[in-house]
Curated annotation (Swiss-Prot):
Cofactors, names only: [4Fe-4S] cluster
Subcellular location field: Cytoplasm
EC top class named in words: transferase
GO cellular component terms, semicolon-separated: cytoplasm
Disulfide-bond pairs as recorded: C153-C383
Record-given protein name: Probable RNA methyltransferase sce1580
Annotated Radical SAM core domain residues: 146-378
Domain of life from the UniProt record: Bacteria
Keyword set, alphabetical order: 4Fe-4S, Cytoplasm, Disulfide bond, Iron, Iron-sulfur, Metal-binding, Methyltransferase, S-adenosyl-L-methionine, Transferase
Length: 398
């Protein structure tokens, strides 16, 4: 049997009741987990929040909406590689923006808030990026070229508090949330790099980088609204995927508000094994997760289940049977991902024979199944390997 393949695509504060789990001797939430409270950058605003800012500056609701649309198109609507648009009173006047709005708009910095700290090209042409924020926080993104389109793996937090045992980011703890503009700026930087490198344009975004997107859902949704705005970045909502470890109580708000697809990281066929590698399962069982998906999944939409395969842990034919039974009744597909080297040496990738047997068994149940092959593994850019903060957080020379 020929196994279908796709390239690897590496899509709000924690609630007070979440346990302060520990990893490697330190609390998972190491500093303030809040979003930075600055809103002085233009990319921190989608059209709606920009209109609200302008309304508070004295404009009528209709005038504020009209101006915000013009500004979004001017600031973010240019093709990749085009010069940065002018941002001064003359440029605003040329757009037809009245003087009443100039002060509020010109207080917003249109430049990206991130800078490239490291570029790590892989042998397969994947590019791992480490980006530095204004406060020194380090964020990783991964640019994954393909024949028809390039994919960017986007981060939503600095670190992560969810502590999945196969994920390097989970060992770092949660340092802080990313602001919407910092999420957007990952895309701005990557889109320019993709144009510079040639090849297929950046058209696909997956929130599968550092962090749990549902733990920063407000900023993630705001960023997605700007990224999918036809006046701005123009990403198709069907080409934006947000991956969650399974924070079940955020699934309904996500489907209500997001212009994006949903991926759920499952990784085990039963609660006992899932909880052994994913602490979130202690709060949201697999049954609760399935119920939340079934209740919220809009008509005509599908959910993507991600299933990282570990040798002799979750890769037996009987495990495929259990997984097929679990996803039965849901409009879905399953991405099977051979695990990459990570923090737990006991979790190893399966042999090719066990991988093929698992996929054949799952497909035999009528489950749409794809295999996601590793990309960027040699530079630490594959699924579960993003830990650039630890690599680069070195004392600065005196």
């Amino acid at each position: 049997m020929r196994v279908p393949e796709i390239p690897e695509e590496t899509a709000s504060p924690l609630r007070a009741g979440d346990p302060p789990a520990q990893v490697a001797g330190h609390p998972l939430i190491r500093r303030s987990a809040r979003v930075p409270r600055w809103r002085a950058r233009l990319a921190d605003h989608d059209a709606a929040s920009l209109a609200e800012l302008l309304r508070r500056a004295g404009g009528t609701a209709s005038a504020a909406r009209a101006v915000s649309g013009k500004v979004v198109r001017h600031a973010f609507g240019a093709e990749p590689g085009a010069p940065a648009p002018a941002w001064d009173a003359r440029a605003l006047a040329a757009l037809g923006v009245g003087a009443w709005a100039h002060e509020a708009l010109l207080a917003l910095d249109p430049a990206p808030s991130l800078e490239i700290a490291e570029r790590a090209p892989a042998q397969d042409d994947t590019l791992r990026l480490v980006l530095r924020a204004g406060d020194g926080a380090l964020i990783e993104s991964v640019l994954i070229p393909g024949p028809a389109r390039t994919t960017l793996c986007v981060s939503s937090q600095v670190g992560c508090a969810r502590a999945c045992s196969f994920c390097e980011t989970g060992r770092l703890g949660l340092e802080r949330q990313l602001a919407a503009g910092e999420i957007v700026d990952q895309v701005r930087i990557a889109r320019a790099l993709a144009a510079e490198r040639g090849g297929a344009p950046l058209r696909n975004l997956v929130f599968m980088g550092m962090g749990e997107p549902f733990d920063n859902l407000g900023e993630v949704l705001k960023a997605i609204r700007l990224l999918t705005d036809p006046r701005a970045f123009r990403f198709a909502p069907s080409h934006v995927t947000v991956s969650t470890v399974g924070v079940a109580d955020k699934i309904e708000p996500f489907f209500r508000d997001a212009r994006a697809e949903l991926a759920v990281s499952l990784n085990a066929p039963d609660d006992a094994r899932r909880q052994a590698i994913m602490p979130v399962n202690a709060r949201f069982s697999m049954a609760a997760l399935k119920e939340a998906i079934a209740r919220a999944l809009p008509p005509g939409r599908r959910v993507l289940f991600e299933y990282v395969l570990f040798d002799r842990f979750n890769d037996a034919p009987e495990d495929a049977d259990l997984l097929a039974a679990y996803v039965a009744g849901l409009r879905c597909r399953v991405n099977v991902i051979p695990c990459n080297p990570g923090p737990d040496p006991a979790l190893r990738p399966p042999s090719a024979a066990r991988l093929d047997a698992f996929v054949a068994r799952l497909s035999g149940h009528g489950v749409t199944t794809l295999v996601r092959r590793p990309r960027g593994r040699d530079v630490g850019g594959a699924c579960g390997q993003l830990a650039g903060m630890a690599r680069l957080r070195q004392p600065e020379p005196a």
